Amino acid sequence: MCFLPFCTIFVFFALANHNIIQMKKLLFLVLFVATAMMGQAQVSKMLGQWNTFDDKTGDMRSTVNIYEENGTYQCVITTLYEKDANGKFQVMKAPYPKGFEGVVGTQLFSEMKVDGDQLKGRVYDPESQKTYYGKVTYKEKTDELILRGSLDKAGLLGRSQTWKRKK
């Protein structure tokens, strides 16, 4: 993102008006808009298909699709995986084994909204069939999502999973 237009406006305003209070107000506005735009850019990188992994075993569990709809972010399970005889992951096909029926198509996010450079809302755990407070953070260096589900809003009592972008 280029901040040159913002800086140019600020310098022009500062030279045209030597009023310090107005310059401070403009600087605050420029920084506020720039921060909001950077957070939105981070969140847009979360959209798309992601492979999920069991936080205890590290095994690939599913592919999910994250998308924006009516100002909130949704996440639906699109594919389940299982290990074959050689230990490689393959797509689990219907009819699904007991306990996996109805999992494909399950919505994992509810009330997920942008909060800075994260998504915050509620996350559903199909395994426990419970809903928790949820937070999603994008790690740009590794192109991964960190999903934190917790009993408390602060995220102290819970667990995290790392999701990797589907290639």
Language-model-detected regions and their locations in the chain:
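Central antiparallel beta-sheet cores of small beta-barrel/beta-sandwich binding domains
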Residues: 52-54, 59-127, 131-133
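Short, compact, well-ordered microdomains
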Residues: 134-135, 140-147, 160
